Amino acid sequence: LNPTYGTVTLGQPLEAASILNRLQAIAKVPLLNTADFEAGVGFRIAGATQFPRLMAFGAARDERLAEEAGRITGEEARALGVHVNFAPVVDVNNNPRNPVINTRSYGEDPEMVGRLASAYIRGLESAGVAATLKHFPGHGDTDVDSHLGLPIIKHPRSRLDQMELVPFRAGIAAGADAVMTAH
């Protein structure tokens, strides 16, 4: 395990908690454990709660459900020893040619994305897990998968302020602890 970066494949919940506890015990400084639990802990760990992708929450337009998903994800993450969740996705799904965001987004309305993300953040952080907004400055209106190429938003700053940045501002106001840049 590199002192500044490590990755562990987490299997079942008990196995994951055991691995993270052992790593924490042997670390010379306390570890800050992070994970990508976009759709619940079950998104990465078999046997934990897995939620539908965020678009389902957007279709329901129910902040209470988004907050509850955040709370459950946070409680399960903390039980494993995870401190930071790389979620929620706050990209606005406004380009049908986008090959990677689509169902990972709450939807095409930036205000609604901001409201649902804020509710999720409240739930996640009520369980003691830090939230990470992603993918700054927005990956919704691109047509390239950032895992395979460099996505570019070809709009002026004024358009970013009206669309892509709206959910980021809402998430920051709700208390998000981190922002992940597009990659």
Regions found by a protein language model. Name each.
Residues 144-162:
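Binuclear metal-dependent hydrolase catalytic cores centered on His/Asp/Glu-rich metal-binding motifs
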Residues 1-135, 165, 169, 173:
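N-terminal beta-rich core of secreted/periplasmic extracellular enzymes
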